[in-house]
Swiss-Prot record:
It comes from Schizosaccharomyces pombe (strain 972 / ATCC 24843). ATP binds at D529, E530, M531, G532, L533, G534, K535, T536. PROSITE patterns: HELICASE_ATP_BIND_1, HELICASE_CTER, ZF_RING_2. A motif (DEGH box) lies at residues 656-659. Probable helicase, member of the UBC2/RAD6 epistasis group. Functions with DNA repair protein rad18 in error-free postreplication DNA repair. Involved in the maintenance of wild-type rates of instability of simple repetitive sequences such as poly(GT) repeats. Plays a role in surviving topoisomerase-mediated DNA damage. Keywords: ATP-binding, Cytoplasm, DNA damage, DNA repair, DNA-binding, Helicase, Hydrolase, Metal-binding, Nucleotide-binding, Nucleus, Phosphoprotein, Repeat, Zinc, Zinc-finger. This is DNA repair protein rad8. Its EC number is 3.6.4.-.
Length: 1133
């Protein structure tokens, strides 16, 4: 039981939950070990009778000559049941009968006494160690070391020769060989922290704090008030280090520490007195690992008689060696991508631990940042930062109810928060100087584009973009060394006035004496101008301004490139979506003057056989190489560095539509992160789509330290935002955006208060349409079934369990609003129509009325294209004898009749089972699907059924067209048949609907081009070129996803959006393909919406700026609640 007491006293600091003991500590006496009194009485008894125990009369322990009573006392303290005669003799002889020394030797692993065995091979070393200790004890008695405080300095030099003590002592000097021997064989686990001013050390005092330590020794007048205290860290034994797991070994290799977190303290005679509490010891030990921190202490109060576990009040003084190399090097380092994710996490964990302990120290010494001359007057509260600390005692209890899942799913950012983030970026961009247009650049640049060029050049050259003096980096804080420092004179400390400040990154724990410039040490940035402002032109102007490395940049390029990678010194790599490759190529050719500025597409069959040789030869290397994300991913998966995109160190890499890599775990993002480049740029109008983590992947591509480390990002951005500390997270992100991002919108004002760009007016109107009777029947049948399904799931509480089914029903309803033909491949069973007024056959019959087979109208029918030739056919109806024929219809045999007459004729023959029906004139059979109806085009391009106009056209009689197709065709005829035809862009999210529109355009003989995701890059390029340059092609049908971003379609000025999307921003992006820089005509936008359908209710959801798949600014639970409300709104529940 008494051994247990000793172990508790000696090893309690290893327990992380041990509370610190400060001056105001409320630790009561009864919180000490229960058997402490018994242990103290035993030790005190032995301390006061050491010599007597060594020579006590009584029964000896075997033949060893050791007193049995001494052995019993030793066993009672150590807790051992038995001890070998050999070991007892050795311990007793070496300790000279001093029970205190014997117990310390027994529990000190460096002596390896517990494993002593006279028959083992290792015993020789143990015997030698004990023999040497025995020889020393004969020269300097342990009794003198423990009791005679006036004659023990020389002896302590023998025990620990590294201590520089005075040699004025009456004790006989110890020879050098014994001193060296003792240096190896004494307490290796203790390393003294002597405060010795070495040649290059310059110590500066920063503060002090008080702490209540506790003793592990006992004695009378061992400490005095005001006495100097020495602090010693305990080394990790080899055995302890070997027990570490693989992960801990990696962390130790990063930390390079061979010390534990135990810190002992000794008196001025270097006699160990006790230990510091766990928290204080952990802080001091962790900071000491950095090499430039030093700690000294004095005794404030100690009992005259110290016992095991007695409280000792100390004052600890903190110093920094301002000449230490680690404090005088750049606080920024270039990020590399070679570190494995596990090692990166371990390194970040160690750095965060270092930061937490540093901030804890600052709170103890009441050290606050110096706000004078800083770029912010806002106070930085260290306690607030510690709320995200890894230290258990630093966590805020108010956040203790966060579940693991709640910390994994980051909440979305609301639009108001995005506006706050971008506001400062836009403000700083308005005051930028302008750069001159490059001489090789063929186009003129607007003023805001020249400002962007200046900003980008500054980013690549590493200079301050506003020309002002460097500012303190917003993540760093300046601290002032205390001027009036009161501490004992025996602490050697510099009082020079040259070093008045030091700098600390309160988010990472890094410390430096150098000024942390706000200009980061990376090359590149994020060009985030709003869509339509000409980001492509701005980047091309940068390429012409800085086409290659400058002379002083080449050594840096080779230093920062991956091993063995050649440098492509004059080539910029542009990575873009496949749909934009041709646009980049054409724009690059258009702006370049001279053949030496050539660009090349690296895609498909156009890829050169040897890209490395192509780009490293400066005489033939292209200025720009354009490739797709797909090609980059494909070569990344091959892991080949001998050829291809990953075989060189590029001068510049540009990611167009860079938000495509916002998922850091995607393979595309990892491919982009791995490419080697000197300058890195991201082009995106939406650097943050929904979540703050969207920005992280872009920052990792930029290799912007330290935020490209995900653990840092998560600790200081993601977790605070999730814990509702939104303002602090946004402040950090804003400080990052301020230096990385340039963003302007169409409403941004220049320095004169005028808009930076003036575009033609844009008119957006919603055209509400009404279903035909057949369409209404189809839609209502689907809506009724869908609504009953939703209601049943809401009542049963299984809505989210059947979420996919609900979304499928919504999809069918939206397709029914476009055209019933989209439902032709719908799987329908009889149970679906159990509650309806018609059967499956009737439902399919309704849909078949709208099915367009795509079969063209016969050419001999199309030849009847004039009013004169048409009137020759409709003189008199052969059925009703009306003259002329009313609502004429024409059969394949070119016999005409009234429309009503033909309908009755077909029904009559069906009743008589005459199938197929026979022509009313020549009695030839005909297919009722091959009946044609004329329409007439007026001079203004409108359609009419009257016999007026200049041109006759034909269409199928019984082929119904959806209400949206009828509305679209009516407007297209006006636009394409006018004296000056205008080009039109038609957007739809359904490619099958684009197929139907294409069939109608073909039947109308309207020239059109098509652009969607199913087409190859070459087909897309051809389609865009045809639409822009062919005067006979005035219509472009395009899918919302494939053509919603990046394209330049300013040749058109009319936009038709056939179906709404859940988010208005997606439609707005599509409109900006037309209403953008370069548009010279007013833009007219028409959005088709069918009344009394889900489309009309989708507009209300758009106005609320959130929906099922992406509710902004809500937790996962709140998103589900909001989704239920949206579904109820859609189905009018």
């Amino acid at each position: 039981m008494k051994r247990k007491v000793q172990k508790i006293i000696d090893e309690a600091p290893l327990e992380e939950n041990s509370p610190p003991r400060f001056f105001d500590s409320d630790v009561e006496a009864d919180s000490k070990p229960n058997d402490l009194t018994a242990a103290n009485s035993i030790v005190d008894l032995k301390t006061n009778s050491q010599h007597e125990n060594a020579n006590a009369a009584g029964k000896e322990y075997g033949d060893s000559g050791v007193s049995e009573s001494w052995v019993l006392d030793f066993l009672s303290v150590t807790g051992e049941k038995t001890i070998s005669e050999f070991l007892a003799q050795k311990i007793w002889k070496t300790s000279n009968g001093d029970l205190n020394v014997a117990v310390d030797m027994y529990f000190d692993e460096s002596f390896n006494i517990k494993n002593s065995n006279p028959d083992s091979e290792s015993q020789k070393d143990t015997d030698a160690s004990l023999t040497q200790m025995d020889q020393l004890s004969n020269t300097v008695s342990v009794k003198d070391l423990s009791i005679n405080r006036n004659t023990n300095k020389k002896a302590l030099n023998a025990v620990s020769p590294s201590l520089n003590l005075s040699s004025n002592s009456s004790v006989q000097d110890v020879s050098i060989d014994k001193e060296e021997m003792m240096k190896k064989q004494s307490r290796n686990a203790l390393t003294p922290l002597d405060f010795i001013m070495k040649k290059n050390e310059l110590m500066k005092y920063i503060g002090c704090f008080g702490v209540e330590a506790y003793s592990t020794a006992s004695g009378t007048r061992t400490l005095q008030a005001g006495e100097r205290i020495y602090l010693e860290r305990q080394k990790l034994s080899i055995k302890s280090q070997s027990r570490n797991s693989r992960k801990k070994s990696k962390l130790l290799s990063i930390n390079s520490s061979c010390y534990s977190n135990i810190v002992r303290f000794c008196n001025s005679d270097h006699h160990e007195i006790g230990k510091l509490p766990t928290e204080v010891a952990s802080v001091i030990s962790t900071l000491m690992e950095q090499g430039f921190w030093s700690f000294e202490a004095i005794c404030i109060y100690s009992d005259n008689i110290i016992r095991f576990g007695s409280n000792v009040t100390l004052q600890v003084y903190c110093f920094i060696n301002v000449n230490h190399p680690s404090l005088n090097r750049s606080p920024f380092t270039l990020a590399t991508n070679s570190m494995q994710e596990e090692e990166e996490h371990l390194k970040a964990s160690f750095a965060q631990n270092k930061r937490d302990h540093l901030l804890r120290l600052f709170t103890w010494i009441a050290l606050e940042p110096d706000l004078e001359d800083c770029n912010t007057k806002e106070s930085i509260h260290i306690d607030d930062i510690l709320k995200t600390s890894s230290l258990p005692e630093a966590r805020d209890e108010s956040n203790s109810d966060l579940t693991p899942s709640s910390t994994e799913d980051e909440e979305d950012v609301v639009s108001d928060q995005l506006a706050i983030l971008y506001d400062k970026v836009k403000t700083s961009g308005a005051e930028l100087p302008s750069a001159p247009k490059p001489s090789t650049f063929a186009l003129d640049l607007r003023e805001y584009q020249k400002q962007a060029l200046y900003w980008m050049c500054c980013k690549e050259e590493g200079v301050q973009s506003d020309g002002s003096a460097p500012k303190l980096h917003p993540l760093w804080s300046r601290f002032r060394f205390p001027k009036d420092s009161e501490f004992p004179e025996f602490f050697k400390c510099s009082s020079d006035d040259d070093n008045t400040h030091f700098y600390v990154n309160l988010y990472t724990g890094e410390t430096t004496m150098l000024f942390p410039n706000s200009m980061p040490y990376h090359r590149g940035g994020i060009l985030a101008d709003e869509m339509g402002l000409g980001k492509t032109i701005e980047v091309l102007s940068l390429i012409h301004s800085r086409p290659c490395f400058s002379t002083d940049e080449i050594p840096e390029a080779f230093r920062h490139s991956k091993p063995s990678l050649p440098v492509a010194s004059r080539t910029t790599l542009v990575v873009a979506p496949m749909s934009l490759l041709d646009q980049w190529h054409s724009e690059a050719c258009k702006v370049s003057q001279g053949t030496k500025f050539r660009s090349m597409i690296y895609y498909g069959s156009e890829k050169p056989l040897d890209l490395k040789s192509c780009v490293i030869d400066t005489s033939t290397a292209p200025l720009i190489i354009i490739t797709s994300y797909g090609v980059l991913l494909s070569e990344f998966s091959q892991q080949s560095h001998s050829s291809g995109l990953f075989s060189v160190h590029w001068f510049r890499v540009v990611l167009d539509e860079g938000h495509n890599i916002r998922n850091r775990e995607s393979k595309t993002a990892k491919a982009c992160h791995s490419i080697s480049s000197q300058n890195r740029w991201v082009i995106t109008g939406t650097p943050i789509v929904n979540k703050l983590d969207d920005l992280y992947s872009l920052i990792k591509f930029m290799r912007y330290e330290p935020w490209c480390n995900y653990t840092y990002w998560q600790t200081f951005v993601s977790l605070p935002y999730q814990s509702k500390d939104v303002l602090k997270a946004l402040n950090v992100v804003q400080s990052i955006l301020e230096f990385l991002v340039l963003r302007r919108t169409k409403e941004t004002k220049d320095r004169n208060g005028n808009s930076i760009v003036t575009l033609p007016p844009k008119t957006v109107k919603i055209e509400y349409l009404d279903f035909s009777d057949s369409e209404r029947k189809i839609y209502d049948s689907l809506y009724t079934k869908a609504k009953s399904t939703v209601n049943a799931n809401i009542v049963a509480g299984t809505l989210f369990r059947n979420y996919t089914t609900i979304l499928g029903l919504l999809l069918r309803l939206r397709q029914a609003c476009c055209d019933p033909v989209l439902l032709s491949n719908m799987t329908i069973n009889s149970e679906t129509f159990d509650d309806f007024e018609f059967s499956v056959e009737q439902f399919n019959s309704l849909i078949n009325q709208f099915v367009v087979t795509g079969k063209p109208i016969p050419s001999d029918i199309l030849k009847i294209d004039t009013l004169k030739s048409f009137e020759a056919l409709i003189t008199e109806c052969p059925i009703c004898c009306n003259e002329p024929i009313q609502n004429p219809l024409l059969l394949n045999c070119k016999h005409a009749c009234c429309g009503d007459c033909l309908s009755e004729h077909i029904q009559y023959q069906k009743r008589r089972n005459i199938i197929p029906p026979l022509c009313h004139t020549c009695r030839q059979p005909f297919n009722e699907q091959d009946v044609y109806k004329p329409f007439f085009v007026k001079n203004n391009g409108t359609q009419s059924t009257l016999l007026v106009g200049e041109e006759v056209k034909w269409k199928y009689w019984n082929r119904l067209q959806s209400v949206k197709l009828n509305g679209l065709l009516g407007q297209l005829r006006q636009l394409t048949h006018s004296s000056e035809p205008e080009k039109v862009v038609i957007f739809s999210q359904f490619t099958t609907f684009l197929d139907i529109i294409a069939d109608v355009l073909e039947s109308e003989k309207m020239g059109y081009a098509r652009f969607d995701g199913t087409m190859s890059q070459q087909m897309r390029s051809t389609a865009l070129e045809t639409f822009r340059n062919d005067p006979d092609v005035n219509v472009l049908i395009i899918s919302l996803k494939a053509g919603g971003v990046g394209l330049n379609l300013t040749c058109a000025n009319h936009v038709f959006i056939m179906d709404p999307w859940w988010s208005w921003s997606v439609e707005a992006q599509a409109i900006d393909r037309i209403h953008r820089l370069g548009q010279e005509k007013p833009v007219f936008v028409t959005r088709y919406i069918v009344r009394d359908t889900v489309e009309e209710r989708m507009l209300k959801i758009q106005e609320r700026k959130n929906f099922i798949t992406g509710t902004l600014g809500m937790s996962e639970g709140k998103q589900q609640v909001q989704s239920i409300e949206d579904i109820k709104m859609l189905f009018e529940y």
